[in-house]
Amino acid sequence: MILIIYAHPYPHHSHANKRMLEQARTLDGVEIRSLYQLYPDFNIDIAAEQEALSRADLIVWQHPMQWYSIPPLLKLWIDKVLSHGWAYGHGGTAPRGKHLLWAVTTGGGESHFEIGAHPGFDVLSQPLQATAIYCGLNWLPPFAMHCTFICDDETLEGQARHYKQRLLEWQEAHHG
């Protein structure tokens, strides 16, 4: 099962993430947990989230990039749900062996995220990748949709279909 942990503080304003979710929903075996819809008060049901994670084979952290980072509720989710004794540390093996895909949208162009004048995706992904590895997750190459503020509908839809294809290819490779 693919579990998408969706963290968009303003989901009604998102054209890119909305299209990505629409495409993902067309696949069998996909569950979407919209954190800002489930937890507008930031009071995360840790047991429910851990139960959802335990059913998943692929975990996707999908969100818009905000100031070169993740939205605050996703950070809190990571801090609370991936807890000591459950996700890491003595007896913390629950997520071990599962896969993690970082699916992020940006307002900037792809060149904005090349190492040089700006930090590249290899740098920006390091905290998430380190978290994944620490919890025994298999880190997959990230999916990034760039220029989402200026893309036309056709481009956004094409990128959303590419996202769906990534998920489908993972399903086919891991579940025949």
UniProtKB/Swiss-Prot annotation:
Q: Where does FMN bind?
A: 8, 14-17, 65-68, 105-108
Q: Which UniProt keywords apply?
A: Cell inner membrane, Cell membrane, Flavoprotein, FMN, Membrane, NAD, Oxidoreductase
Q: Does the keyword Oxidoreductase apply?
A: yes
Indicate where this protein is primarily found.
membrane
Gene Ontology process terms (BP): positive regulation of potassium ion transmembrane transport; potassium ion transport
For this protein, what is the EC number? 1.6.5.2
The entry lists its GO molecular-function terms as: electron transfer activity; FMN binding; NADH:ubiquinone reductase (non-electrogenic) activity; NADPH dehydrogenase (quinone) activity
Subcellular location field: Cell inner membrane
- Its EC top class is oxidoreductase
| UniProt xrefs under InterPro entries | Flavodoxin_fold, Flavoprotein-like_sf, K_H_efflux_KefF, KefG/KefF
**Catalytic activities:** a quinone + NADH + H(+) = a quinol + NAD(+); a quinone + NADPH + H(+) = a quinol + NADP(+)
Needed cofactors, names only, are: FMN
**GO CC annotation terms, alphabetical:** plasma membrane
Q: Name one Pfam family in it.
A: Flavodoxin_2
The family line of this record is: Belongs to the NAD(P)H dehydrogenase (quinone) family. KefF subfamily.
PANTHER family per the record? GLUTATHIONE-REGULATED POTASSIUM-EFFLUX SYSTEM ANCILLARY PROTEIN KEFF (PTHR47307:SF2), GLUTATHIONE-REGULATED POTASSIUM-EFFLUX SYSTEM ANCILLARY PROTEIN KEFG (PTHR47307)
Fill in the subunit field for this protein.
Homodimer. Interacts with KefC.
For this entry, the protein name equals Glutathione-regulated potassium-efflux system ancillary protein KefF
The record lists the organism as Shigella dysenteriae serotype 1 (strain Sd197)
Q: What is the lineage of its organism?
A: Bacteria, Pseudomonadati, Pseudomonadota, Gammaproteobacteria, Enterobacterales
